[in-house]
């Protein structure tokens, strides 16, 4: 894993909520090992996801590697605005991508590299 890659996981969509806004869906997903939970707002017109879809999620500090950009189907730039301790030695990290929000909860061992800073989110099927 590249030094700029802060998180690299495979997730499966457990639900899709399309009710809030046009062209925006809020998905909930669980990682392949069921140790991380994700809630993510996405532009469903550009990158539609359905229940039970599997996708790769990477969070990086930069896009200096051309391989990262070329492999991704959907990229967002945002800011980690809150990191808090959750129950059972878990951490919750909150990111805003220009109003599209992400919350991810998981083990401190996997999320420790995410801090209050700007990040890139890369998704691919």
Curated annotation (Swiss-Prot):
Region entry Non-specific ssDNA binding, spans: 17-39
Database matches in SMART domains: RPOL8c
Disulfide bond sites: none
Keywords annotated in UniProt: DNA-binding, DNA-directed RNA polymerase, Nucleus, Transcription
GO cellular component, one term: RNA polymerase III complex
Subcellular location(s) per record: Nucleus
GO annotation, biological process: transcription by RNA polymerase II; transcription by RNA polymerase III; transcription elongation by RNA polymerase I
Gene Ontology MF annotations: DNA binding; DNA-directed RNA polymerase activity
Oligomer status and interactors: Component of the RNA polymerase I (Pol I), RNA polymerase II (Pol II) and RNA polymerase III (Pol III) complexes consisting of 14, 12 and 17 subunits, respectively. Directly interacts with POLR2A.
Protein function: DNA-dependent RNA polymerase catalyzes the transcription of DNA into RNA using the four ribonucleoside triphosphates as substrates. Common component of RNA polymerases I, II and III which synthesize ribosomal RNA precursors, mRNA precursors and many functional non-coding RNAs, and small RNAs, such as 5S rRNA and tRNAs, respectively.
Family named by the database record: Belongs to the eukaryotic RPB8 RNA polymerase subunit family.
Protein name: DNA-directed RNA polymerases I, II, and III subunit RPABC3
Native species: Schizosaccharomyces pombe (strain 972 / ATCC 24843)
Organism classification: Eukaryota, Fungi, Dikarya, Ascomycota, Taphrinomycotina
Gene transcribed to yield this protein: rpb8
């Amino acid at each position: 894993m590249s030094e700029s890659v802060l998180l690299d996981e495979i997730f499966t969509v457990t639900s899709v909520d399309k009710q809030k806004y046009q062209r925006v869906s809020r998905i909930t997903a669980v990682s392949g090992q069921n140790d991380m939970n994700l809630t993510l707002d996405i532009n469903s017109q550009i990158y539609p996801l359905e229940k039970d879809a599997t996708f790769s999620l990477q969070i990086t500090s930069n896009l200096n590697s051309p391989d990262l950009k070329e492999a991704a189907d959907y990229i967002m730039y945002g800011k980690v605005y809150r990191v808090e301790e959750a129950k059972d030695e878990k951490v919750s990290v909150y990111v805003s991508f220009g109003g599209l929000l992400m919350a991810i909860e998981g083990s401190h061992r996997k999320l420790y590299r995410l801090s209050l800073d700007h990040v890139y989110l890369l998704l691919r099927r």
